[in-house]
A protein has these predicted regions:
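Short secondary-structure junctions
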Residues: 82-89
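Active-site-adjacent beta-strand/loop module that shapes the phosphate/pyrophosphate-binding cleft
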Residues: 38, 86, 95-119, 126
């Protein structure tokens, strides 16, 4: 479910039936998210690690910005920490505000087409190279808009993912 938000940015409300933690005074958490695209035009999805909110849901890798970090710096740090990859070029692409029950999150999506290193799942997560429609389930709500944008760019028609049951 989406709604209007300040400055023309849309708001995606995840699990709208659940109560929001922190009420109206919640701060927005900025997150850098990497859309790693390989030579076969597949993108990388990772499962959320054990013990985290939305455990085992599939998402694009990334993490929270630390104080005084740019999106590019945060993404570079997070992908090295979580996946063991050194990224070369970050293209800031799109932004989506997501109202999760546990947090209000501004997702800063970046395309990454060049990196060094081998994938290492350093937080106990799984990974899958995917194309549309994605075959992994369940997909994190904040990931769904990206799948739609990728479909629009590539001319893909049809469901981008399987709905969670």
């Amino acid at each position: 479910m989406t709604g209007a938000f300040a400055h023309g940015q849309s708001l995606l409300v995840a699990d709208a039936h659940l109560q929001r933690e922190g009420g109206q005074e919640r701060k927005t958490v900025d997150v850098a998210v990497g859309i790693l695209i390989n030579a076969h035009n597949q993108f990388l999805l990772t499962s959320r690690p054990p013990g985290k909110v939305y455990e085992a849901y599939w998402e694009f890798p990334g993490g929270k910005l630390e104080a005084n970090e740019t999106v590019e710096q945060a993404l570079t740090r997070e992908l090295e920490e979580e996946l063991g990859l050194k990224i070369d070029d970050v293209q800031i692409w799109r932004q989506q505000l997501v109202d999760y029950p546990h947090a209000l999150v501004r997702l800063n999506f970046c395309k990454v087409r060049s990196w060094q290193g081998n994938l290492e799942m350093r937080e106990g997560q799984q990974f899958a190279w995917q194309s549309l429609p994605v075959q992994v389930v369940p997909v994190l709500p904040g990931t769904v808009p990206v799948l739609t944008w990728l479909a629009e760019e590539s001319g893909f028609v049809g469901d981008t993912h399987q709905a969670s049951s």
